[in-house]
Amino acid sequence: MLNSKGFDLWADDYDKSVGLSEEENRYPFAGYKRILGDIYKIIMEKPNVVVLDLGFGTGTLTTRLYENGCTIYGQDFSSRMIELACEKMPGAHLYQGDFSRGLAEELKQVSFDFIIATYSIHHLTDEQKTVLLKDLLAHLKAGGKILIGDVAFSNRKALDQCKKEYADEWDNDEIYCVADELRTEFPNLIFEKKTFCSGILILAGENFVLYETIGLEGK
């Protein structure tokens, strides 16, 4: 697993690394652009929203949201990633911190229409994911949603099948979301499968009005 300095070193080449895997439709980034595009469409259905991005990296998705009028908050534990993102989004509120330990102090008093995490939450253990998601639900505005785009699977069998197929490339330091298992703690969780190894997980806050899902292939 990369630490904060490891991500600093990777930052300049991150987008290129993602692109190679995505174009070849291979684990781990198969469907990457589609997932970011679908999350973007969901958010842009609602005007003047406040968005928190956890693990925003170089700001690939949040930059598009920022340019289209969203108020952007973010937390990342790489100072270099923050530096790159600030160049693209000078008016965004970006903070350094390890979100496996919770939100940065500056974010704890803010409520959000959307909280997003794209290809970042897999660095947390299952227990840390549960604690974080419960905390994040408390920071949603009425009708708000958590959107997680990542390497993810509908069930353990699908994960094991992917792990077997990509045994030489599998990252054992990363802990991927399994929708069926997360529903033990979050029974209303929705999983939109996008590829054999990726999808979007959706958790809603109180007074949630369900948006029409985009490209739903399976739960």
Q: For each predicted feature, which ranges?
A:
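Conserved class I S-adenosyl-L-methionine
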Residues: N48-G55
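Class I (Rossmann-like) S-adenosyl-L-methionine-dependent methyltransferase catalytic domain
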Residues: M1-I43, T58-E106, L147-K219
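A conserved beta-strand element that flanks and buttresses the S-adenosyl-L-methionine
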Residues: I116
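Short catalytic micro-motifs in class I SAM-dependent methyltransferases
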Residues: Y119-S120
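A short glycine-rich, Lys/Arg-flanked "PGG" loop and its adjoining helix->strand segment in the class I
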Residues: T130-A142
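An acidic, carboxylate-rich microenvironment
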Residues: Q128-V131, E181
